[in-house]
Amino acid sequence: GKESIWIPAVAMYPNTTNGCADLAQVELSNGPEIKTLDFDKDSDENAQFAVAFPKSWNEGTVTFQAFFTADSTNTGTVSWALSGVAIADNDSCNTAFGTAVAPTAKAHSGTANDLDVTAESGAVTIAGSPSTDEEVYFQITRDVSADSLTADAKLLGIKIFFTTDAANDA
């Protein structure tokens, strides 16, 4: 069946080249403090993270939703794209990501620090030969050519959806 895994911004890191800003902690006047990775409005920026999927994963495509905010009253859209690559034991870590896939760009609400959640993306094909007992690296990108928010997009995390073909990992 369909399962999900939450990847918070605190589990991601900016790329060395064209990376987003380092993790920031935002203190709001009420409610939780939030931790974000801030992606610039002027150029595509990236962050990466890794997942070791359970043995019950069917080794197929994944989909995702991005959770983000902006400390702006702008109502522009934000476009997030995800790509992935599976690396097996004794494989080179220097392997290219698959094709990035983006859901429809999501408009910010126009209220500073409101939570925005994208629609679920189309299928993201993971490069390499995905299998269990492999590490899958992902790259999340703000694609500024496909969005219109004139402020930093503050990524809170993403939810990855994957399909299982077994009841457990036994």
Please describe what each predicted stretch is:
Residues 59-61, 75-77, 131-135:
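Extracellular Ig-like/FN3 beta-sandwich strand-entry sites
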Residues 60-70, 78, 158:
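A short beta-strand element within beta-rich, extracytoplasmic domains
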Residues 74-82, 152-155:
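Short coil-to-beta strand junction motifs in C2/discoidin
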Residues 115-146:
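Cysteine-clustered segments with highest specificity for TGF-beta superfamily mature ligands
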Residues 41-56, 61:
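Short beta-strands within extracellular/lumenal beta-sheet-rich domains
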Residues 1-32, 89-115, 165-170:
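Glycine-rich, low-complexity segments
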